[in-house]
Amino acid sequence: MEKFQGYLEFDGARQQSFLYPLFFREYIYVLAYDHGLNRLNRNRSIFLENTDYDKKYSSLIVKRLILRMYEQNRLIIPTKDLNQNSFLGHTSLFYYQMISVLFAVIVEIPFSLRLGSSFQGKQLKKSYNLQSIHSILPFLEDKLAHFNYVLDVLIPYPIHLEILVQILRYWVKDASSLHFFRFCLYEYCNCKNFYIKKKSILNPRFFLFLYNSHVCEYESIFFFLRKRSSHLRSPSYEVLFERIFFYGKIQHFFKVFVNNFPAILGLLKDPFIHYVRYHGRCILATKDTPLLMNKWKYFFVNLWQCYFSVWFQSQKVNINQLSKDNLEFLGYLSSLRLNPLVVRSQMLENSFLIDNVRIKLDSKIPISSIIGSLAKDKFCNVLGHPISKATWTDSSDFDILNRFVRICKNISHYYSGSSKKKNLYRIKYILRLCCVKTLARKXKSTVCAFLKRLGSGLLEEFLTGEDQVLSLIFPRSYYASKRLYRVRIWYLDILYLNDLVNHE
């Protein structure tokens, strides 16, 4: 984002807080397209095959697109003529997609500027380790052991495009950008619904920005009520409140909330809760009674339906009791387990046995869902029996082995925090045998004959790499005793969900 701001220093549109003129700057397209393409390539899934990421940037295409935007009537194409109307070999949907990439980059500028201004004068240290997904899990491992209920909420999507436009009004000041955004959004969705496949990947950066702005609006009200009712003040909440007319709107909302829902207001008085949002869901952990958890549940339902005009069913909010139910969280199944401990204490000639019960959070691997994901990608059948990967037989032996090793190491890396490694070994076994069957099929041989010819050294690649790193971290005696395989290890370099989790 600093690179974009450097180019905008000499642009008068930035100083006047107008974003609309930036749509007609050719250098913005160069920066936005390069930034978006690099982001897509960096997040490419190891399971995706033949994905269309090879669209070339062309200055001629951008110039033609800018000329079309000067005459917006030329951008409006009837639905029946979507496939026929094209120039330079591209349909109109391609140009709406380019505009959406540009819009996502441009509108992120006021977000970043206000975010930077809110942190000025505050000594907040950046911790890059907190960006890791695994940094959340040990935090919950320490906190959830003292709680008994978790509210699992599926965050709803807005059912109408106009809701997204209204949310952006608090961030974008000029009306021209909002009108242009509304026009392109409706035209883009009309093109998409007409002839685009459901599973095609279309500008995830743009829709991720829209989704985050939608969720940010919901969390602002929730955190505001939480902050008003709590005696503990957190400076990190202030980032969410620097918007136009926000305090006036919230003050009115708070008065209506107090007058119409006096009973529920007592619910918000100083509750001890933890809130985490992840992958389209959020969890609210607290140590309350079932009655209070049901009040929290209907509070979320009323908040979404009454104040955000989003149809939200109560079935989308699940109340989980950690001692009995499993919580699906970031690809793990978490639950509380009681570990009885017997401590012998001796005082003079008398000895006592003291029974202590320690609550521990179990993080298990959801083996059934992962096997389902592996079966969907043709690594095994629905029962978990390995099969050959027929679509990879055209590659070289080195490429096939390298792809399987990379998948296996990524899974081991992600699920290293599991409390029971038996399911992890089963997943490794499926991938190893699938690799052998794929190589044997490519060489037109049987599995037994293939292993006899190459020996057991073929599978050593699956065992090296991560095990070598762990042997350097832990003492040799500890590593040799095999106790390492029963220890949960959290890594602080995991920034994305595992691909098998995304397939759920």
From Swiss-Prot:
UniProt cross-references to InterPro entries, sorted A to Z: Domain_X, Maturase_MatK, Maturase_MatK_N
TM annotation in the entry: none
One Gene Ontology term of the molecular function aspect: RNA binding
Family statement drawn from the similarity comment of this UniProt entry: Belongs to the intron maturase 2 family. MatK subfamily.
PANTHER family: MATURASE K
Superkingdom to which the source organism belongs: Eukaryota
Pfam family, one: Intron_maturas2
Job description of the protein: Usually encoded in the trnK tRNA gene intron. Probably assists in splicing its own and other chloroplast group II introns.
Record GO biological process: mRNA processing; RNA splicing; tRNA processing
Record organism: Arabidopsis lyrata subsp. petraea
UniProt protein name: Maturase K
